From Swiss-Prot:
Domain of life: Bacteria
Broadest EC class assigned to this enzyme: transferase
GO cellular component term of the entry, any: cytoplasm
Key words, A-Z: Cytoplasm, Queuosine biosynthesis, S-adenosyl-L-methionine, Transferase
NCBIfam families: PRK00147.1, queA
Protein known as: S-adenosylmethionine:tRNA ribosyltransferase-isomerase
Organism: Deinococcus radiodurans (strain ATCC 13939 / DSM 20539 / JCM 16871 / CCUG 27074 / LMG 4051 / NBRC 15346 / NCIMB 9279 / VKM B-1422 / R1)
Molecular function (Gene Ontology), one example: S-adenosylmethionine:tRNA ribosyltransferase-isomerase activity
Subunit structure: Monomer.
Gene name linked to the record: queA
Entry's transmembrane regions: none
């Protein structure tokens, strides 16, 4: 875990100073095509404007890129209430959040619209004959419901579910289109309900160029939850950070630890990768294994593992804006966002990217 001298009141002040108003037309509704033709702002002592496909020119052969290889699941499902004596059958929107292994087998947390009380039965899919039965068995503090299925629902989600998209994306295209577009090219382990979007800029061709120049690759898994979109409302100290599951294999933990010991740069692809690395860091090495993290990185927190961070442009008032301010410094982030606003960068999940250097001294 990272060292922290973070003062919540200071974080409140930083968040207020970093506030910005964003015109709606600057929110990217589709990604660049090809993916690596998005813009890349390089933020260090100076700000430079490049294209994402220029990344090989900005990295060193000794660098280690660390990716989050979690895969977005089709977690948005339409369900119906059972028909009893000719009544019922109403539609319920279900957003599956994650499997709650500590509660029991085949239990998921989910947001329901409209919400249902414990004891209610739902059928996910077309109808009761072909659908999948779930019972509401509990209510969580944030309003999510616990659903217990009769069987493992995961193998059926590709058939009955749709990909969940951020609330600021107007999904005009087909679900099949989004299943390709809102997924990194290296996604592997299913479990996220939001994409680790910094990785959306990579193409197989760009990865091959990085391999050819000797940049090493490692990966971690952090299943991104819907809480990633939750804004900070009120004092930072009162914000309840969402829990997310992560895993680092023995091989990848060893590769990252070795890079740190050899003084090579670790380049985190995305804030989810930063949160995983900092959660698994014990002060001397990255620990292999699986766990759950609620890590909240705010100004005053010393980020230990990554030296560079590839990330998109985040929402005002968000935990991610505080994370990048902790990583690169408030002044640099303020200058970077001012530049992004004045130079027509595209924001949020499908927008342009930044390459941030870690601030090593105050």
């Amino acid at each position: 875990m990272p060292d922290s001298t973070a003062d919540p009141s200071t974080a409140d002040e930083v968040l207020a100073r970093l506030h910005f108003d964003l015109p709606e037309d600057r929110i990217a509704q589709t990604g660049a095509e090809p993916r690596d033709t998005s813009r890349l702002m390089v933020v260090g002592e100076q700000i430079k404007h490049r294209m994402f496909r220029d990344l090989p020119d900005l990295l060193r052969p000794s660098d280690l890129l660390v990716f989050n290889e979690s895969r977005v699941i089709p977690a948005r499902v339409l369900a119906r209430k059972p028909v009893v004596n000719g009544f019922g059958g109403g539609q319920v929107e279900v957003l599956l959040l994650r499997e709650e292994f500590d509660v029991g087998a085949n239990v998921w947390s989910a947001y329901l619209k409209p919400a249902k009380r414990a004891g209610h039965e739902l059928w996910l899919g077309e109808n009761e004959a072909t659908g999948h039965r779930a019972e509401v068995v509990g209510v969580l503090d944030d309003g999510a419901r616990l659903l217990r299925f009769d069987h493992d629902i995961k193998p059926h989600l590709d058939e009955i579910g749709r990909l969940p998209l951020p609330p600021y994306i107007n999904a005009g295209d087909s679900d099949e289109t989004w299943r390709e577009r809102y997924q990194t090219v290296y996604a592997k382990t299913p479990g996220s309900v939001a994409a680790p979007t910094a990785g959306l800029h990579f193409t197989p061709e760009l990865l091959a160029r990085l391999d050819e120049m000797g940049v090493e690759r490692a990966s971690v898994t952090l299943h991104v939850g819907a809480g990633t979109f939750k804004p900070i409302q009120g004092p930072v100290a009162d914000h309840v950070m969402h829990a997310e599951r992560y895993e680092v294999s023995e091989t990848n933990a060893a590769a990252i630890t070795r890079a740190k010991a050899e003084g090579r740069r670790v380049v985190a692809v995305g804030t989810t990768t930063v949160r995983t690395l900092e959660s698994a860091w014990d002060g001397a090495a990255v620990r292999a294994g699986a766990g759950e993290t609620r890590i909240f990185i705010t100004p005053g927190t010393r980020v230990e593992v990554p030296d560079l961070l590839i990330t998109n442009l985040h929402l005002p008032g968000s935990t991610l804006l505080l994370l990048v301010a902790a990583f690169a410094g408030e002044d640099r982030i303020r200058a970077a966002y001012d530049a992004a606003l004045s130079q027509d960068y595209r924001f949020y999940s499908l927008g342009d990217a930044m390459l941030l250097e870690r601030l090593t001294s105050a």
